[in-house]
């Protein structure tokens, strides 16, 4: 969190993955730093996705996920100072282009829990100003 506290700007759009209570803990810490935080998760409706994946209907699963992320982006706050994304594995170019257009002056930060070699969407890294990792 120390790196985020050093960044200028108080409005943060935090895009998490809804993993246990990590996202809520991160939001609480950001608020302690006097940041105004808006949030959404890229992993809502996970049960529907799991069912389709188990049935080997990956195209349907991907379409549902993409629509869900589109809907979340359209509902998200705009003109943020920082867009802070954890993992970002479900984003495609269109999602990040839309986020950039809604937050034209924001610093885009990607935080990775995994090594870059494990990313399936390496092409989206170019949309981020900073990439941080646990390493």
Set out the residue ranges of the language-model regions.
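Extended catalytic core of nucleotide-activated donor transferases of GT-like folds
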Residues: 13-15, 22-27, 32-33, 38-135
């Amino acid at each position: 969190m120390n790196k985020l506290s050093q960044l200028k700007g108080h409005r943060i759009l935090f895009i998490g993955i809804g993993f246990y209570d990590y996202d809520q803990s991160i939001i609480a810490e950001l608020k302690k730093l006097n940041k105004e935080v808006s949030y959404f998760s890229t992993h809502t409706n996970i049960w529907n996705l799991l069912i389709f994946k188990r049935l080997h209907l990956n195209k349907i699963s991907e379409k549902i996920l993409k629509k869900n992320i589109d809907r979340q982006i359209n509902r998200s706050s705009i003109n943020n100072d920082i867009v802070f994304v954890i993992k970002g594995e479900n984003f495609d170019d269109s999602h990040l282009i839309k986020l950039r257009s809604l937050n034209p002056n924001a610093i885009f930060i990607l935080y990775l829990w995994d090594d870059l070699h494990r990313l399936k969407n390496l092409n989206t890294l170019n949309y981020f100003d900073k990439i941080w990792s646990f390493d």
